[in-house]
Curated annotation (Swiss-Prot):
Protein's gene: hba2
Subunit-level organization: Hb 2 is a heterotetramer of two alpha-2 and two beta-2 chains.
Known role: Involved in oxygen transport from gills to the various peripheral tissues.
Lineage: Eukaryota, Metazoa, Chordata, Craniata, Vertebrata
Protein name: Hemoglobin subunit alpha-2
Tissue specificity remark: Red blood cells.
Annotated binding of O2, by residue: 60
Residue ranges annotated for the Globin domain, each copy included: 2-143
Residue numbers binding heme b: 89
Residues with PTM N-acetylserine: 2
Matches recorded under CDD domains: Hb-alpha-like
Length: 143
């Protein structure tokens, strides 16, 4: 399940290309998450409006995508590089780690919609593996 050096380069290249639309991808992915998996709204009960496309959902989606971009920069050591985020999600926020995989799926859908030509099968495989490793790194402190 590890990424080859070619796949790491593919991930970095693709994320570089989509940087102009990363906010849109993050906002749309989180909107899809709360729409398709409504149980995830329970993590955002403190928001006035947790409906798809609302300002808080959009803002948190952008923040989340920023974290994914940070992870791209730490692609060679995701577990070590994301340890504090793993601790935050495990001990403070108490997010069920299955939700990382659900959000990753929503991100893949959005990436493929917004960048249909760039989202080749090779990019799909590399980004999917990267997001799976990212989810695993975020779940590190749950063990």
């Amino acid at each position: 399940m590890s990424l080859s050096s070619k796949q790491k380069a593919t991930v970095k290249d693709f994320f570089s290309k989509m940087s102009t639309r990363s906010d849109d991808i993050g906002a749309e992915a989180l909107s899809r998450l709360v729409a398709v998996y409504p149980q995830t709204k329970s993590y955002f009960s403190h928001w006035k409006d947790a409906s798809p496309g609302s300002a808080p959902v959009r803002k948190h989606g952008i923040t989340t995508m920023g974290g994914v971009y940070d992870a791209v920069g730490k692609i060679d050591d995701l577990k070590g590089g994301l340890l504090s985020l793993s601790e935050l999600h495990a001990f403070m926020l108490r997010v069920d780690p299955v939700n990382f995989k659900l959000l990753a799926h929503c991100m893949l859908v959005c990436m493929s919609m917004i960048f249909p030509e760039e989202f080749t099968p090779q990019v799909h495989v590399a980004v999917d593996k990267f997001l799976a490793q990212l989810a695993l790194a975020l779940a590190e402190k749950y063990r």
